[in-house]
Each structure stands twice: as structure tokens, then as C-alpha cells.
Amino acid sequence: MNQQYPSVLLEKAVGEFSKLPGIGRKTAMRLVLHLLRQDTATVEAFGNSIITLKREVKYCKVCHNISDTETCQICANPQRDASTVCVVENIRDVMAVEATQQYRGLYHVLGGVISPMDGVGPSDLQIESLVQRVSEGGIKEVILALSTTMEGDTTNFYIYRKLEKMGVKLSVIARGISVGDELEYADEITLGRSIVNRTLFTGTV
């Protein structure tokens, strides 16, 4: 046991919390001590919610968004514009775009971006399923709404090359978002305008 901790159990709990992104050991300690001050029922409810989430959450068979059912609420909504698909990096980006209330189409969640430095290639992402969706017909426009980073631009270009001869309009969100920014950190007004003012993708990185 590390002499810094009075309990092995405390040390293990802090260690697990500190594995979460953005959580250092000091913050992990505060969270663990907070839980220790709660009653048993509250802590059990917290733990069970995470276990249940991991065991039972589904990914939409159409767009790969998180869902409680086989098809997510967005894809199942007949009032959404099924002819337009917005391609995003992750589920947080879906939530960010939805918060703008400026988009009524569907989504396609890639699960990341192409990043050779991190060992992420096209086959690790949901790119082929996007190609399959487009090939099935009905989609008129694909909006590329990835982060304005080198990896995001590389992924945009790769998708463009896969779809350029499939008869769909390929557009990209306007560069109201600063280069290097991730979509989820853009404010709602800026992101909303970037979607509304999207431009034709020309295939340049």
C-alpha cells in the first residue's frame, strides 16, 4: 500500500477514477471521498447505473449513435430529413449539433478520425457503413462535420474519395470554427451558423 493512502481500498478507488479522461489523482480523491460521505443506497445507485449502461446500451444499427433500442430516436423519427446525413466524429458531436436546433437531417457517427500516429486507420472507423448507406439510395447530401484538425481534414478527404462518384452532394461546415478546434467545444451559435452556411466540399485538404 502506498503510504500516502490510509487504506488500500481508497487507493484502488482513486486509481480507477483517475483513469477517466481529465481526472487527475487529486480530483479522483475528491470524488471518492464525496462518495464515501453518501449513504449506501446512493452509492449503489451510482455504481449500478454505470454497470447497467455498459451492459445494456446499444448503438444504432443505422447511424451508430448511442441508443436504448436497435434504431435511435433520430433515425426512427419520420419528421427528420432522411435525404441529408451529417457525418460526425463521435456521439458528443451529435449532441452538440442537436443543441443548435439548426439541423433536421440524420447523422452518421464515425467513432473517431483517421490518425496514423494513434494507430487509427479507415478500417477502424464507420466509413464503409457510410458508403453502404449512400449506395442504398435516398441520400442526396452528405455533410462533413468533423473537427477542423489535420486528422479531421484527412478523414474528410478520404470520405470524399469514397463518395465522389456516387451522385451525392458533399458539403462541409463553414469554417466559423477555429482551425484545430473540436466540434463539441464550439458554442451553439457558431456551430449552428457553420452548418447553415456549409459549402460544397472541393476535395482539397
Curated annotation (Swiss-Prot):
May play a role in DNA repair. It seems to be involved in an RecBC-independent recombinational process of DNA repair. It may act with RecF and RecO. Residues 83-178 form the Toprim domain. Transmembrane segments: none annotated. A zinc finger (C4-type) spans 60-75. It comes from Bacteroides thetaiotaomicron (strain ATCC 29148 / DSM 2079 / JCM 5827 / CCUG 10774 / NCTC 10582 / VPI-5482 / E50). InterPro entries: DNA_Rcmb_RecR, Rcmb_RecR, Rcmb_RecR_Znf, TOPRIM_dom, TOPRIM_RecR. This is Recombination protein RecR. The gene is recR. PROSITE patterns: RECR, TOPRIM.
